[in-house]
């Protein structure tokens, strides 16, 4: 573990607190990276954004695991998905375990005995990096609706500045699942000389019309909440929880497979018999309401709007008349692409589309399609075949760089 300069104002990750187990530091398993403390990195230089504006002065929350070698060649960047953060692995003092702790740690597929792993919380998030909840430099009040719309490309440019701070010229690998996979892909396109390997898990080179539609319905639920106040609800000391609940319920349905939902809930009733009401009747309804309530307590509505819109906008083929083959022609990285058979949010066909474009350009690609019942969320879960594939790939990287 590298020593970090700690900002006492850095908060724990509520996403991890809500969705992952807690472990008192004294009972941590031996394959944990242990107790971790995030670092707040401040950047004074303005960051040009894709929308033509710029962000003047911003913070990024960062966590690191493992040790950066003398050559600075063993660094791995982990990019997070919608509601995750910089807290990838290990445990915070409050007991929150990192969102990909089963993947990153000593002896794990991404082995911190060999690699220096970095997690960065993206701009616009609500877990410490500059976002809608942060004070606007001119007013001192939260940005709210004035926070600029950001894109995957903006996040990658910000992450590149983190790499510069560490003196990392090239990552051994950039890795992510779902939206994190889009960032990993974008890294290989925007900074081809800085990415040795690109690991894209349960992701897609662009959203389908159906996925954009899901995001629009979720955003509409938030925007129509009377407590939204045009995005400036902080001043009213309220939160659009009703909209956030519905948005999360919609999203959560897409993260699970039909098989998984059938096995977990089926048509099981909450009570012994139907009650002929519009209250909760089925266990699956109870589960969705629970997930919605939990999410609304810790997540920020403006952040949800920003991140789902960034998902919508990502389409590297757009600048090449829709040709993904042309879009990836200048990449230099080797790739590992992983999909899951029951993932209908980002179906295997989308991963195969990326693989084909890379093969058309004679890029080295390893592709794994894992037969797993858990839908899109499978990328977060511990599956022996999935982890064996990732472990073998990182073993190859370690041998290449002598880690």
Curated annotation (Swiss-Prot):
The active site is at residues 178, 343, 376. GO terms for molecular function: homoserine O-acetyltransferase activity; homoserine O-succinyltransferase activity. Pathway: Amino-acid biosynthesis; L-methionine biosynthesis via de novo pathway; O-succinyl-L-homoserine from L-homoserine: step 1/1. InterPro entries: AB_hydrolase_1, AB_hydrolase_fold, HAT_MetX-like. Its EC number is 2.3.1.46. Substrate binds at residues 248, 377. HAMAP family: MetX_acyltransf. Belongs to the AB hydrolase superfamily. MetX family. Residues 74-383 form the AB hydrolase-1 domain. It is an enzyme of class 2 (transferase). Coiled coil: none annotated. Residues 7-26 have a biased composition (Low complexity). One of its GO terms (cellular component) is cytoplasm. The lineage of its organism: Bacteria, Pseudomonadati, Pseudomonadota, Betaproteobacteria, Burkholderiales. Residues 1-31 are annotated as: Disordered. It comes from the Bacteria. This is Homoserine O-succinyltransferase. Homodimer. GO terms for biological process: homoserine metabolic process; methionine biosynthetic process. Its main location: cytoplasm. It is found in: Cytoplasm.
């Amino acid at each position: 573990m590298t020593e970090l300069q700690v900002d006492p104002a850095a908060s724990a990750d509520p996403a991890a607190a809500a969705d992952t187990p807690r472990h008192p530091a004294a009972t941590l398993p031996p394959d944990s990276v242990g107790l971790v403390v995030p670092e707040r990195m401040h950047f004074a230089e303005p960051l040009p954004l894709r929308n033509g504006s710029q962000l003047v002065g911003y913070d990024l929350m960062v966590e690191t695991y493992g040790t950066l070698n003398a050559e600075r060649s063993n660094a791995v960047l982990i990019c997070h998905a919608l509601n995750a953060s910089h807290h990838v692995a290990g445990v915070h003092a409050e007991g929150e375990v990192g969102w990909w702790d089963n993947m990153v740690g000593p002896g794990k597929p991404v082995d911190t005995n060999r690699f220096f792993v970095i997690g960065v919380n993206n701009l616009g998030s609500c877990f410490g990096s500059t976002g809608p909840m942060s004070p606007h430099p001119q007013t001192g009040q939260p940005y709210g609706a004035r926070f600029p719309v950001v894109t995957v490309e903006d996040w990658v440019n910000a992450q590149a500045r983190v790499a510069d701070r560490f003196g990392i010229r090239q990552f051994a690998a950039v890795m992510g699942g779902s939206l994190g996979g889009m960032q990993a892909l974008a890294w290989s396109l925007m900074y081809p000389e800085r990415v040795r390997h690109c690991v894209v898990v349960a992701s897609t080179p662009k959203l389908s019309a159906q996925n954009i539609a899901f995001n629009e319905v979720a955003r509409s639920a938030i925007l129509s909440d009377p407590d939204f106040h045009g995005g400036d609800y902080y001043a009213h000391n309220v939160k659009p929880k009703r909209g956030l609940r519905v948005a999360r319920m919609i999203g959560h349905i897409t993260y699970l497979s039909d098989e998984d939902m059938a096995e977990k809930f089926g048509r099981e009733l909450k009570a012994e018999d139907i009650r002929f009401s519009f209250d909760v009747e089925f266990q699956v309804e109870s589960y969705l309401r629970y997930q919605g309530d939990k999410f609304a307590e810790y997540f920020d509505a403006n952040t949800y709007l920003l991140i789902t819109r960034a998902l919508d906008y990502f389409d590297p083929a757009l600048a090449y008349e829709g040709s993904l083959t042309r879009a990836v022609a200048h990449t230099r990285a080797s790739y590992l692409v992983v999909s899951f058979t029951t993932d209908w949010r980002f179906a295997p066909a989308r991963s195969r589309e990326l693989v084909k474009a890379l093969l058309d350009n004679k890029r080295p690609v390893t592709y794994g399609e894992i037969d797993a019942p858990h839908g899109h969320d499978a990328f977060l879960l511990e599956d022996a075949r999935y982890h064996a594939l990732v472990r073998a790939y990182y073993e190859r990287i370690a041998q290449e760089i002598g880690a």
